[in-house]
Amino acid sequence: MAEEKVLNWGICGAGKISNDFCSAMMTLSRYEREHKITAIAARSQEKAQKFADIFEAPKAYGSYKDVANDPDIEIVYIGVIHTEHVRLSMMMLEAGKHVVCEKPLAPTWQECKKVLDYAKEKKLLFLEAVWSRFFPVYDAIKDEVNSGNLGDISMVTTQFCIPIMSVERLCRKDLMGGVLLDIGIYCIQFACHVYGEMPEKIIATGSLNEEGVDEDGCVILLYSGNRKASLVYSGKTASGNNTATIMGSKGQIFIDDCFWCPKSVKLTDTTLENKIPEGPSPYNFYNSGGLRYEADHAFKLIRSGQLDSPKYGYKDVEMIHKIIDEISKQIGLKY
């Protein structure tokens, strides 16, 4: 390719996370040369137009199908409720669009596999947007783990506790609610980031609400060589000190609150920081400016012809969702 043309984005969903993604993407130093928010789609034309006006998108659609049919759009960000993730991902892939879909892609590995296999068949990029993996400090964490500076790593701990069970989409079974898919997935991805393999054994416990969706969980992942990960997450407690630690025989890495979207990380001999700038539209979630990194990563993958991310690729989706499947089985979580 002679030059890197602008990547035209279609945005499905005009809610909080889509706002944060668009606002964060616009903070990229090369935004105007590499990215363009071309179209917004929502469940109503009015809502789509209001969102489009905020981000100066030239097109607003009251139907997601219109995004699929728009020939100007090369990539689609899916930021709707996750009960729609598989359907819309398949729709956009069928239309020949690359896809960045908010997590969780689906409640089961088999449903995730259906989407990934179709993306491979269509020779298109598909990213499940576990945004943690695209933060520069997560690269630094992986490099430090692989360097040997920590010695033999034998323990990983994470905690993610915030009072969110009053949120409608999380407390209802028909909306595939629960905290495992919402915040527990961040704890799981962190352990997988460190160890890079499936655990040999999983021990999980959690409590379900009256509708049968999970409100909290404690999970132990047991790996070969007596290595372990201890994961704690809850949607019904007061906010905790939501940190993560990697412990080795020679040293440790500490990631302060919020470990899934950290502003900084304390390595064995230095502290590294991310740039998390404010965007043109106020953010709704912690450190949402970091969403800029997944947008930038998608651009680089597409323009270099890579269809599987080295930071969070198909093997990572498989590993994490197979662990989710086993945890769901053990705690009695069924959709």
Provide a role label for each language-model segment.
Residues E3, Q189-P262, G290, D296-Q306:
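Contiguous beta-strand/loop segments that form the cofactor/metal-binding neighborhood of enzyme cores
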Residues M1-F55, L333:
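N-terminal Rossmann-like dinucleotide-binding module
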